[in-house]
Amino acid sequence: MKKNQIDIVTMGCSKNLVDSELIMKQFEENGFHCTHDSKRPQGEIAVINTCGFIEAAKEESINTILEFINRKKNGQLNKLYVMGCLSQRYKDELEAELPEVDKFYGKFNYKQLLTDLGKADVPACNGVRHLTTPRHYAYVKIAEGCDRHCAYCAIPLITGRHHSRPVEEVLDEVRGLVAQGVKEFQIIEQELTYYGVDLDGKHHITELISRMADIEGVEWIRLHYAYPNQFPLDLLDVIAEKPNVCKYLDIAFQHISNHMLDRMRRHVSKQETLDLIAEIRRRVPGIHLRTTLLVGFPGETDEDFEELKEFVTNARFERMGAFSYSEEEGTYSAIHYKDDVPEDVKQARLDELMAIQQGISEELEAEKVGKTFKVIIDRKEGEYYVGRTEFCSPEVDPEVLVSSSEKSLRIGKFYDVCITDSDEFDLFGEVVK
């Protein structure tokens, strides 16, 4: 057990990761040494940043807490603290069930932890944080919360209403990250296209991204978690015209059947969805779309699912994730709908949908063979350098494996790479001499 060492464990999404990075920086400015997601935690203090989005995430968070409780019982840990979405939503229940945890913090009061550790004079962060990602890319969280209230989603119950950071504050953070050597920026929030509306009633995402793209040193900007309803079409012009805004958009459609979209409270129709996809592809040729779909929602019929399969087949998304519905207490669907799709049917539909997408993804990736792309190198792994094109977000998308026998490549540097082969998961390439 190492004195003055704090082991941080982050569960869930990249938005949680940003919170962990912020508090790690504050810990370090107050004399602590921090590790993140260490396979061999040795600190005298542990902080677990939990996820409470869906049942599987809750279970993973609880199991992690229990692991550290055992370490504490075995004398391998002095203090255990829990923060994040799970403790934001279930603080009272967790305190009653897990008294071994020294204190639970919510999603927004975690900075109180420093005061509780005797560090009352907490320096202001101003977006400066301890990056846990490779030093050439970072996540930038531009807002918290969500005003949409989709029927299945617990996020508004956890994080509250949409709250945008001011434009200048975000831009200052990006400038600071550029000064640290960051080249690539993953722009994240729960509903990116709503950014700024809570500030003055106007969409400001286009202004933000346009101004961000003009900052010297910003090589790539990638946009995550857009919403199809009231999508600001002028954002597409920025994606098309700014060379450092990646031709990539993460936009969750969830379903295509009008019956399902209505029950999900998505406030968008099938035709509006199809029209938006066509407009995106028209305005930004070559754009890669990542989407998320939900199967097994209450009331989903065989006909609804057939529509969804047809949608995936015709839309030919470059990237797609899909999930089966799980009831989340307090949500509209949990209160008003019966979870009436059997679990085996949910799983069968999920498997069938992913099989369709797998074939599409393999075809689209194979079309890249023989073409040259700008690739950033993330790491060396065995006999390959592993990198990504502008069409690939870290952690979730295919990677480019470049043979290390060619020459020594530098992590965080861009190279022109000719794609020589593809498989189910990745691309293979050679640096253009």
Model-identified regions with their sequence ranges:
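Conserved SAM/AdoMet-binding glycine-rich loop
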Residues: 78-84, 89, 94, 179-305, ...
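Glycine-centered loop/turn positions within well-structured domains
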Residues: 111, 148, 193, 258-259, ...
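Conserved, mostly hydrophobic/aromatic
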Residues: 170, 187, 223, 251, ...
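Active-site proximal loops enriched in glycine and acidic residues that flank catalytic Cys/His/Asp
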Residues: 189, 225, 253-255, 291-295, ...
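Extended hydrophobic-aromatic, low-complexity segments
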Residues: 247-248, 261-262, 285-288, 303-305, ...
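Terminal RNA-binding accessory module
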Residues: 335-433
